């Protein structure tokens, strides 16, 4: 019992203390409805819901939408790489933002359509770094952050495969 020596409890004791429900980071399940009611009076609520509705109406842009038309006219590798980086970032940045909006809109409304669309988009984005159409800093940390936020927020809605993918 010396304060200088830490003796961790046995694993069985630690496991006993674990909750049997998924712990939430953004919104606790028990206070979610109250959170939604309080949020409805905020202008940000309307902004996120309106933006999410707009995102839902537009198909996700993908790697095939990256404009590479001018690539062949560039005379050196450095200019080509800068061009690919700039053009790929246009698509990537927009879709990262769209994914974030859908996650927030789901948390604000419990509309499962937002969660399903966000899940589909985020899983798709997670493979973009493997493409030759993407160059430069892909912001993988942003995608990981977005995926973990989606995992936490949609946990009860996700299939086992979706949980593994996120």
Task: Please report, for each region that a protein language model flagged, where it lies by residue.
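Mature N-terminal, pre-catalytic/accessory segment of carbohydrate-active enzymes
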Residues: 1-49
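Short, mixed-charge, low-aromatic patches
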Residues: 5-10, 72-80, 102
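Short, flexible helical or helix-coil boundary motifs
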Residues: 6, 42-46, 55-63, 75-78
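Mature catalytic domains of secreted/periplasmic carbohydrate-active enzymes
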Residues: 29, 34, 66-68, 74
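Amphipathic alpha-helical interaction segments
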Residues: 34, 40, 55-56, 146
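Aromatic-lined, polymer-binding surfaces characteristic
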Residues: 48-49, 57, 63-71, 81-166
